[in-house]
Amino acid sequence: MSALIGYILLMTLMFSLAAGLYFGLRSIRLI
């Protein structure tokens, strides 16, 4: 059970990191 929670946390962390990088690069390009 704890392994599943850890996996979900890891996936959400990776997704948020990728989204942050993507939007960060887009905002830098717009400026």
From Swiss-Prot:
List, alphabetically, the InterPro entries matched.
Cyt_b6/f_cplx_su6
- Which cellular components does GO assign to this protein? chloroplast thylakoid membrane; cytochrome b6f complex
Its recorded name reads Cytochrome b6-f complex subunit 6
Annotated organism of origin = Emiliania huxleyi
* Binding partners and assembly: The 4 large subunits of the cytochrome b6-f complex are cytochrome b6, subunit IV (17 kDa polypeptide, PetD), cytochrome f and the Rieske protein, while the 4 small subunits are PetG, PetL, PetM and PetN. The complex functions as a dimer.
Its biological purpose is as follows: Component of the cytochrome b6-f complex, which mediates electron transfer between photosystem II (PSII) and photosystem I (PSI), cyclic electron flow around PSI, and state transitions. PetL is important for photoautotrophic growth as well as for electron transfer efficiency and stability of the cytochrome b6-f complex.
Q: Say which family it is in.
A: Belongs to the PetL family.
Which keywords, in A-to-Z order, does the entry hold? Chloroplast, Electron transport, Membrane, Photosynthesis, Plastid, Thylakoid, Transmembrane, Transmembrane helix, Transport
| Places the protein is found | Plastid, Chloroplast thylakoid membrane
Membrane topology per the record?
Answer: Single-pass membrane protein
Residue stretches spanning the membrane: 3-23
Q: Give an example GO molecular function.
A: electron transporter, transferring electrons within cytochrome b6/f complex of photosystem II activity
One GO biological process from the UniProt record? photosynthesis
